[in-house]
Amino acid sequence: TIGIENRYRYYDLPLPDEMGVLLGLNTDAKYGFQFDTGHAQALEALGLCEKGIWLRRFSDRLIGVHLHDVCGIQDHQLPGEGDIDFGSIARSLPENCQKTIEITPFATSAGITRCLEFLAMSGCIISF
């Protein structure tokens, strides 16, 4: 399976319209959208993407998600320690979606445990 990820910087491809073009090139189920929660939030915070546009437009092609939080525009924070509404994200994730927790290498064991508990409570992961 190949997933095309939304990117962190405004000058990186793809932005939402470009993602639509790329996903339109191949409709095979093994070619889809890899959603990065932090990248989306950072672009929203900068006013470059409207809130929730990525999942509204591409949830039907969603194959995976990178779960991390953002404080302002600083990404790769532990989920639950930033600005992202993970409950609303959880409602858009299909059951077969691959989930990756993508966090700073400076996270502590206790912080990671809190993060996993938070993601379970928000519905992003089944249990911890």
What spans do the regions from the language model cover?
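Histidine-acidic metal/acid-base catalytic patches
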Residues: 13-128
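Aromatic-lined carbohydrate-recognition surfaces of secreted/lumenal glycan-active proteins
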Residues: 1-12, 34-35
